[in-house]
């Protein structure tokens, strides 16, 4: 079995739902996330603001980047997952919500294409989410923090970062290397992701970044390696980020089943695989999102006819690997924002 396929199979469990503020019953963005990592325990920490000395730098064990520290880092709530076996934690499993009401949850998109000359064993990995929480006052500023760090130091995995505040929700999708793209979820839209890239068309005329950010080499890089060729030379309107950068192996049964299940629960029918978002057919509340993150896969009833011991968690959104489920309910007053949390599986809450 290839290294890429093994990695995809290991991390194809998480789910994230985002509801735009005009599609939400609360009038603010809603975020729901199931974090799936086997044999983990979850700890929640409150980290205060910290002032730093001039010239101070920060490093992380999973990368070689030496990152200049800012004068002051913001306070945040840190949901940390740590393994029950061995030493250390799950470095790509943690989530954050800071004192300004900026929340970060992520989903693996393991399987991005990368050339031999761009393989990153160092750069930034786990550090990215924490640095966003420490440095951003808004979701948009969080995207800009992530973009600057990935451009300078490179990113060593493939991941979707969901960076949200009460008014805006952004999806920042990083590839292995120095490329990334970010798209804003529309205020009247609903978004779901299992573990694949979901950003497709990029509006390269959006130089004011109302809805998109992108790396300088985003299009040229896959062109150099034969992953994308424009139909008309010099016209990149047919560029599709997910298709250019994503391995087909991510279209596995686990991802496909969760996509079908989530979209059916949310809008009444499955959506094409790798859909980014759709116009919300109704307004969604906390209870709607709880129902989705608790969902077991649709064929379970049929399986029970053949095997009464069949687990409902195999290909569901709520799985036997789910370590923590979170729903973030933003409020106009950040002190009244609420994080609903279940340990471990949400179907038990």
Predicted regions mapped to residue ranges:
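Short, charged, surface-exposed loops that flank catalytic or proteolytic processing sites
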Residues: 135-141
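A contiguous strand-loop segment
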Residues: 3-125, 145-273, 283
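Short, conserved catalytic/metal-binding motifs centered on acidic residues
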Residues: 17, 142, 326
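Short, well-structured alpha-helical segments that form the helix of a local strand-helix-strand
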Residues: 142-151, 289-293
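Short, Gly/Pro- and small/polar-rich lid/capping loops
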Residues: 1-22, 295-315
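Second-shell loop/turn segments in exported
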Residues: 118, 128-135
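Substrate-recognition/cap regions that form aromatic- and gly/pro-loop-enriched pockets
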Residues: 302-349
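Accessory, solvent-exposed terminal regions and/or long lumenal/extracellular loops of proteins
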Residues: 252, 256-311, 315-320
């Amino acid at each position: 079995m290839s290294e890429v396929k093994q990695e995809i199979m290991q991390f194809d469990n998480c789910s994230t739902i985002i509801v735009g503020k005009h599609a939400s019953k609360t009038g603010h963005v809603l975020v729901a996330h199931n974090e799936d990592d086997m044999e983990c325990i979850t700890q929640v920490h409150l980290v205060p603001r910290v002032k730093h000395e001039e010239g101070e730098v920060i490093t992380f064990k999973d990368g070689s980047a030496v990152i200049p520290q800012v004068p002051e880092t913001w306070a945040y709530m840190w949901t940390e997952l740590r393994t029950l076996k061995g030493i250390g934690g799950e470095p790509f499993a943690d989530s954050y919500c800071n004192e300004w009401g900026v929340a970060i949850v992520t989903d693996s998109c393991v399987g991005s294409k990368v050339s031999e000359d761009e393989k990153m064993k160092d750069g930034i990995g786990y550090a990215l989410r924490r640095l966003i929480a420490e440095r951003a006052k808004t979701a948009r500023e969080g995207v800009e923090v992530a973009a600057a760090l990935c451009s300078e130091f490179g990113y060593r995995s493939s991941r979707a970062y969901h960076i949200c505040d009460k008014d805006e929700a952004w999806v920042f999708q990083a590839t292995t290397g120095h490329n990334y793209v970010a798209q804003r979820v529309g205020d009247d839209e609903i978004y779901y992701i299992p573990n694949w890239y979901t950003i497709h068309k990029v509006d390269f005329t959006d130089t004011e970044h109302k809805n998109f950010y992108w790396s300088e080499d985003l299009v040229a890089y896959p062109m150099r390696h034969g992953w994308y060729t424009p139909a008309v030379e010099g016209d990149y309107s047919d560029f599709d980020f997910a298709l250019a950068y994503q391995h087909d192996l991510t279209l596995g049964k686990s991802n496909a089943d969760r996509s079908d299940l989530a979209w059916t629960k949310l809008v009444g029918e499955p959506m094409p695989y790798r859909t980014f978002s759709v116009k919300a057919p109704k307004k969604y509340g906390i209870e709607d999102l709880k129902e989705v993150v608790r969902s077991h896969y649709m064929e379970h009833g049929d399986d029970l006819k053949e095997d009464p011991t069949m687990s409902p968690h195999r290909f569901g959104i709520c799985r036997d690997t789910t370590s923590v489920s979170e729903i973030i309910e933003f409020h106009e007053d950040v002190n009244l924002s609420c994080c609903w949390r279940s340990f471990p599986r949400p179907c038990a809450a």
